[in-house]
Design a protein with these regions (language model features):
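C-terminal motif of bacterial Sec signal peptides marking the signal peptidase cleavage site
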Residues: 12-15
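Non-catalytic beta-sheet/beta-sandwich ligand-binding modules that flank or precede catalytic cores
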Residues: 20-287
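Residue-level detector of intrinsically disordered/flexible regions characterized by low predicted structural confidence
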Residues: 4, 19-20
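Sec-dependent signal peptide recognition
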Residues: 2-10
Length: 287
């Protein structure tokens, strides 16, 4: 029973403003041009979610013992057809380089998601030799955003980008992305605007007795009134109970929501580490 519970939990372990300042432009095998800094910033973080806790045969169809799990988070959506374990390298604190045994974007692979890749393999040990860097070393491509997303993207080859923003095993989850969504992407049954948020690792309710549908009351959205942030509590939450790291927050206000926060000690990751207070700006594409 414990193995089944752990497998259920691990499944969930799972804007494009151009800079006005003159910078070197990079034509990185993509449609359009981005600066080197903009391409680098596409890789937001990696989250050392579980250490030697995941069965390799079940998740990777290989007999390799118990594996580490590390969600890697991107600002732009990824092209699943370009995804491969050989796209990634993980550097540990002793200088060893690890290639994942397998990778997956499931279950966060619905339209409007596709921003988190779960790496499975051996990436070091939490206390004595933690992972310190994640590198994209193969041809991993982003995709254009689709109708209903407030952010924009283009097709970019991410090969060569890295991050040292590795959240340690003992730390709790935090928000890494938010955007406004509408049309077919919107799963809210009520309200006037919907904000999609994404966590850097999988989450479940931390407070005893809470279900995922109760989490809306701990989120706060903010509108901007002449530089003053006005708080708004969502009236409900959608895109839940699907074992991924995305939520949709349903607001009744017509004032544009520009920031989202989450109260501390309300959700936890699969390692049972609770969140601290977290906030994120709502991303949008400026023409």
């Amino acid at each position: 029973m414990k193995i089944v519970l752990r497998l259920s939990i691990i499944i969930i372990l799972f804007s494009c403003n151009k800079n006005e300042a003159p910078q070197e432009q990079v034509k990185n095998d993509c449609i359009g041009e981005y600066t080197t800094e903009e391409i680098q910033d596409t890789l937001v973080s990696a989250f050392f979610g579980l250490d030697n806790a995941l069965p390799s045969l079940f998740l990777c169809n290989q007999q390799a013992g118990l594996l580490d799990g590390m969600p890697v988070n991107f600002k732009f959506p990824l092209d699943a057809s370009s995804l491969s374990e050989t796209n990634f390298e993980v550097l540990d604190s002793l200088g060893n380089i690890h290639t994942p045994i397998c990778v997956s974007m499931a279950p966060a692979n619905e339209n409007g998601e596709n921003r988190t890749v779960l790496l499975l393999g051996e990436f070091g040990t939490a206390v004595t030799n933690p992972p310190v860097e994640v590198r994209v070393v193969g041809d991993l491509f982003t995709t254009d955003t689709i109708s209903g997303e407030s952010v924009c993207s283009e097709i970019i080859n991410l090969s060569g980008i890295t991050t040292t923003n590795i959240i340690p095993l003992a730390d709790g989850p935090s928000l890494f992305f938010a955007q406004r969504i509408d049309g077919n992407l919107n799963e809210c049954n009520s309200g006037t605007q919907t904000i999609q948020v994404a966590w850097n690792g999988g989450i479940t309710p931390y407070i005893s007795g809470d279900t995922e549908s109760d989490l809306f009351q701990y989120y706060v959205g903010y509108s901007d009134s002449s530089g003053v942030l006005i708080p708004h509590v969502p009236i409900s939450i959608a895109d839940i109970n699907d074992n991924d790291n995305f939520h949709q927050l349903c607001f009744s206000t017509s004032d544009e929501i520009v920031k989202i926060s989450m109260m501390a000690l309300t959700v936890e990751d699969p390692n049972h580490d609770p969140n601290l207070y977290s906030e994120i700006d709502v991303s949008s594409c400026t023409p």
